[in-house]
């Protein structure tokens, strides 16, 4: 009897596990049902706007003609009659449709001028999107011109070499001017002793007069 009691315990513990697995499968079915509803097709308002825009009547498309156009497109008009009326009212309130005759959902409808202008402006907005592509094409051209400027910078060091060569030529010519300036100094040194020699013989002339006076004195005693 003691051995049968522990065998029943694992059976009770295993029972709740399938109960937990069952709720995990339910959300998967709900997700599958949501996916199946999406490919139902366009909404009622989209079908109504297409049918009204396709009509060429100036006074507008009547409700009976609208139902015929929707039925021709494969839409079940009898089951979704209330949806058609609600769609017409919402489009009129938004301003996409204008009711030319009748009141409420009955009467005739046509597209408003504002909705037509919006459709015409929509393709015009696409053209500005193509304009930014042109500056993108000009950027590589500008990048190609930049290396040309770098070539012009390389030429500048060549000009710097010419002044260096000119400086060396001037440095070589400068010692010649120094030698020319030294020559007049030697000429001045030669002329100064020549003047001193010319002065000395003039001072020696008075010495020659002295012997003449002596001779006169010697001749005087002879007369006695």
From Swiss-Prot:
Residues 1-43, 99-224 are annotated as: Disordered. One of its GO terms (cellular component) is nucleus. CDD domains: H15. It comes from the Eukaryota. Its main location: nucleus. The keyword Nucleus applies. Residues 1-22, 30-42 have a biased composition (Low complexity). Pfam families: Linker_histone (PF00538). Keywords: Chromosome, DNA-binding, Nucleus. InterPro entries: H1/H5, Histone_H1/H5_H15, WH-like_DNA-bd_sf, WH_DNA-bd_sf. Belongs to the histone H1/H5 family. Histones H1 are necessary for the condensation of nucleosome chains into higher-order structures. This is Histone H1.03. It comes from Gallus gallus (Chicken).
């Amino acid at each position: 009897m003691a051995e049968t009691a522990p065998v029943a315990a694992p059976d009770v513990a295993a029972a709740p596990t399938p109960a937990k697995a069952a709720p995990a499968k339910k959300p998967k079915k709900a997700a599958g049902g949501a996916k199946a509803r999406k490919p139902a097709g366009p909404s009622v308002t989209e079908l109504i706007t297409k049918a009204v825009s396709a009509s060429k009547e100036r006074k507008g498309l009547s409700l009976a003609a609208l139902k015929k156009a929707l039925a021709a497109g494969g839409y079940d008009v009898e089951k979704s009659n209330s949806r058609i009326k609600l769609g017409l009212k919402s489009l009129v309130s938004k301003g996409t449709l204008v009711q030319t005759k009748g009141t409420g959902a009955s009467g005739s409808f046509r597209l408003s001028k504002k909705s037509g202008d919006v459709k015409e402006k929509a393709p015009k907005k696409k053209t500005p999107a193509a304009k930014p592509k042109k500056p993108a094409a000009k950027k590589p051209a500008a990048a190609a011109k930049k290396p040309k400027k770098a070539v012009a910078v390389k030429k500048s060091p060549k000009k710097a070499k010419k002044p260096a060569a000119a400086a060396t030529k001037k440095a070589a010519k400068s010692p010649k001017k120094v030698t020319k300036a030294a020559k007049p100094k030697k000429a001045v040194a030669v002329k100064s002793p020549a003047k001193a020699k010319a002065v000395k013989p003039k001072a020696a002339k008075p010495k020659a007069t002295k012997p003449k006076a002596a001779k006169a004195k010697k001749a005087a005693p002879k007369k006695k």
